From Swiss-Prot:
The gene is rpl27. Pfam families: KOW, Ribosomal_L27e. Keywords: Cytoplasm, Endoplasmic reticulum, Ribonucleoprotein, Ribosomal protein. One of its GO terms (molecular function) is structural constituent of ribosome. This is Large ribosomal subunit protein eL27. It is found in: Cytoplasm, Cytosol; Cytoplasm; Rough endoplasmic reticulum.
Length: 136
């Protein structure tokens, strides 16, 4: 079977506090490491989705409703469901990497980077499906 968990692939989180959320793989580790001896992936995802906007709303209200809350986390492959979709959101690999989990300040910075890039992409109107809440 081919390797399909690749950077840029959209995945659904199946377990934990982010269950049901969409995320994108930043880095995949198929063979595991010494501290995590199982296949896992570093993902950046959406914790709070942007709310619906209509044409009658003002600029201020639209700006407020277009906010996104992001998360950055390492997941076991068993807790991720890959989708057929891919997004090419260019997250800065120097900011979003596995070392951010050692220091809370770095983790905040990584989350901020993901949030900014997600909001940027959302405002362009591309990858609409990625920014919609999964109805279940």
């Amino acid at each position: 079977m081919g390797k399909f968990m690749k950077p840029g692939k959209v995945v659904m989180v199946l377990a934990g506090r982010y269950a049901g959320r969409k995320a994108v793989i930043v880095k995949n580790i198929d063979d595991g490491t010494a501290d995590r001896p199982y296949s896992h992936a570093l993902v950046a995802g959406i914790d709070r989705y942007p709310r619906k906007v209509t044409a009658t709303m003002g600029k201020k209200k639209i700006a407020k409703r277009s906010k996104i809350k992001a998360f950055v986390k390492v997941f076991n492959y068993n807790h991720l469901m890959p989708t057929r979709y891919s997004v090419d959101i260019p997250l800065d690999k120097t900011v979003v990497n596995k070392d951010v989990f050692r220091d809370p300040a770095l983790k905040r910075k990584a989350r901020r980077e993901a949030k900014v890039k997600f909001e940027e992409r959302y405002k362009t109107g591309k990858n609409k499906w990625f920014f919609q809440k999964l109805r279940f």
